[in-house]
A protein has these predicted regions:
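Positively charged n-region of N-terminal signal peptides that target proteins for export
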Residues: 1-5, 21
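Active-site-proximal alpha-helix that buttresses catalytic centers in soluble enzyme cores
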Residues: 21-208
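Sec-dependent N-terminal signal peptides
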Residues: 4-13
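C-terminal motif of bacterial Sec signal peptides marking the signal peptidase cleavage site
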Residues: 15-19
Length: 208
């Protein structure tokens, strides 16, 4: 039922954006459809590329999470900090929390993050736990290729948004990685369909 509620919205958005692209060679600039948000954290730009593609395809609004103490552009330079935060389930500060009233208007929130030490970036958890997300639809996406890491990262997002509704609804151990991720890489971050053959548009159709 949860997926069915999202199908018309995503497919309508995809169709509308595709129609616009046939008459205008310039990139679309979404104005936002009012009830969907793409919320993401990105260090190297991989997650950002996918987040921006989702916005282009759906017309959602977008917000990039910034850490109060910025991470290095290359996460390997911050590996000790990242590992410490992940293994100890810490909550680093967020520099740009949204007003609670501003977030409350969204019914559907895409949540994007790299997988760091089998977890989403902990700053994403800090952000999510700052709000009442009861009954909102949360759709996680990640940039990393290992299915084990993706399952563990999904479990963390589900845990910190336990009162929300989730797509996918369940998380079996053998979950197909393509159902929850469109991994980005430095050499394909600017490609129309990053990460795999079906790309972001195919992923949206699968989850929708």
């Amino acid at each position: 039922m949860k997926k069915l509620l999202l199908i018309p919205l995503l497919l309508l958005s995809l169709t509308t954006m595709a129609a616009c692209s046939t008459t205008d060679d310039t990139p679309d600039t979404p104005s936002g459809n009012g009830n969907m948000l793409v919320l993401y954290f990105s260090a190297e730009g991989h997650t950002q590329a996918i987040a921006e593609r989702i916005v282009k395809l759906t017309g959602a609004d977008i917000h990039r999470i910034e850490a109060a103490e910025p991470y290095a552009a290359n996460p390997y330079d911050d590996s000790d900090r990242i590992q410490h935060e992940a293994y100890n389930d810490l909550r680093p500060g967020v520099a740009n929390l949204l007003d609670k009233e501003a977030l409350a208007k969204y019914d559907t929130i895409f949540v994007g993050s790299p997988c760091w030490w089998h977890q989403p970036a902990m700053v994403v958890c800090t952000f999510l736990e700052a709000y009442d997300l009861k009954d909102k639809v949360i759709i996680p996406f990640f940039t990393y290729g290992a299915t084990t890491y993706l399952n563990e990262s999904m479990q963390k997002i589900y845990k910190v948004t336990s009162t929300s509704r989730h797509i996918p609804e369940t998380l079996p151990e053998d979950l197909d990685a393509e159902d929850i991720t469109t991994p980005g890489r430095p050499d394909d971050a600017d490609i129309d369909m990053p990460g795999n053959a079906n790309g972001t548009e195919g992923w949206l159709h699968r989850i929708g």
